[in-house]
Structures are given as structure tokens and as C-alpha cells.
Amino acid sequence: MSNHSSSIPELSDNGIRYYQTYNESLSLWPVRCKSFYISTRFGQTHVIASGPEDAPPLVLLHGALFSSTMWYPNIADWSSKYRTYAVDIIGDKNKSIPENVSGTRTDYANWLLDVFDNLGIEKSHMIGLSLGGLHTMNFLLRMPERVKSAAILSPAETFLPFHHDFYKYALGLTASNGVETFLNWMMNDQNVLHPIFVKQFKAGVMWQDGSRNPNPNADGFPYVFTDEELRSARVPILLLLGEHEVIYDPHSALHRASSFVPDIEAEVIKNAGHVLSMEQPTYVNERVMRFFNAETGISR
């Protein structure tokens, strides 16, 4: 992995610890990668690129507090056919350096537009999980000409509001055993995460940084898209939900998505909770690739 320098801000001890654990998590990355920063109107955005440089682009957006390192069980398969760009979402706990992040849906879409432009991406497939799925949906509704197709996994809100249990478990993260309790809840008591990655997640919880925890905004996230917004989607979408999803009822979310989004394939995956790309990576990797291949005519 090669790193391109950027102006890293002064960090607290917990911030330094987080950066160290992030780098340790990259040891789980099974393929060669390049880590670098790109400039946007909203700050320096950290990206992990893998796969052939001349392959079609695929942009990955992670879940909240998980960062781009969460894709370690998936990246080998996806980067075998695509130039993958795992993007650290601005304003979340990761290596991106936020500046002037208002937290509105418009600004988040413009941030991704800057990312695409500065990576030289005219049009790309996208994959987003949880918070990343919400960002993906927001972007493809506003900039459909830049998205070939999108796999949206366990999106945060998007189709349904959070169950009230989400806030109970999220607010308990900093308590004794709060991280373990939260992760077990999210994954139906089958925490499959590598201990190195869990260490990074814990370090992120302990790193209190206001610029990386934007306040909820009526014009921002979380957000449930209206019927009209969902009907306006012009991009092919694959929606994957775990049968043990806890942030909302997966069957109700699938029903609403299928009722309003014009071009959508939707599926509930067995033996998976919220973090299904890490819980059932073999199936998710293949299912997503099959969807993209059908959209572009690429054969396995």
C-alpha cells in the first residue's frame, strides 16, 4: 500500500489511537491497495483504491463508525473485475478530514460529486451499506447521470424510520461492554468481525470529535425518502436486507422499496443481520457481482 501525504490535523491521543487501529485493520485487506487523499469543497477525503487501474470503477460507501476498512471480506472479489474506490464518508469516524460540512443532503451529494470528479469518474457502479446506502440513494436520486447501477445494503432509514431500539443501543456504545452489546444486537448475536477490526471500532467510539459527529439536520440524515422521491429513481438498484435486520422490519422495507422504486431487485438474505456484507460475504459478493454483470453484460 502506498500513501499520499495530506495535511493531517493535530489529533488527540484518542484520535492518534484511532488512526493506528485503522492502519492495523488495513492489514486485513487481502489485495494490494493504494491509500490517498483527494480535495473536495467539504474537506480532504480519504480513499482506498484496489483492482486494475483500467477496470470499470466501483465506488464503495461504508456504514457509520465502520469506515472503509469494513470491506475487507468483500474487496478481493469485487476488485477482481472493477477498480474499487472505498471512500471514507466525510463527517463520520474515519480518516477523512471534514471542513465546512453542513450535513445537508444537498451538500453530501455535492461532496460525492467532487469525489467522482477528482477521481476522474464519469459514471460508476456503487455499493453502500447502512449510512453508505443512505448516501448512495441520496446521490443517485440527485445525480442519476453519474451512477450506472447501485447495490444498497441494509440502508440507514431510506425506506423506513429507525426502530426506537436503535437509539437505545447506539447511546449505550460508550458504556461498559457497550460495543459488544451493540455489535451483537446488530448481528443477531453472531458477531463475525475480526478482533483487529473490533479494536478499530472501539477506538472510534472513544474518539470524541465534534467535526466527525455532525448534528442531526432536518435537511440531512437520517432521512426517509418520500414516495415521490422513490418514484423518481432512474438508476437500476439492488436492495439487500438481512432477515434478522434490527433497525427496522426488513420485509416492510422491502415492500415499500418494491412498491415505489421503478427499477429494483430486492431480496432478504437468510442468516444475516444488519452488517450482511460481513456476515454473509460469500453470498453478498456473488449476488452483487451478478447484478452488476447483468446490467453491463460482463461475464464472470
Curated annotation (Swiss-Prot):
It catalyses: a carboxylic ester + H2O = an alcohol + a carboxylate + H(+). The keyword Transport does not apply. InterPro entries: AB_hydrolase_1, AB_hydrolase_fold, AB_hydrolase_sf. Gene3D superfamilies: alpha/beta hydrolase (3.40.50.1820). SUPFAM superfamilies: alpha/beta-Hydrolases (SSF53474). One of its GO terms (molecular function) is carboxylesterase activity. Keywords: Hydrolase. The record marks S130 as: Transition state stabilizer. Pfam families: Abhydrolase_1 (PF00561). The active site is at H274 (proton acceptor). Its EC number is 3.1.1.1. Monomer. Belongs to the AB hydrolase superfamily. PANTHER family: MONOACYLGLYCEROL LIPASE. This is Uncharacterized carboxylesterase nap. It comes from Bacillus subtilis (strain 168). The gene is nap.
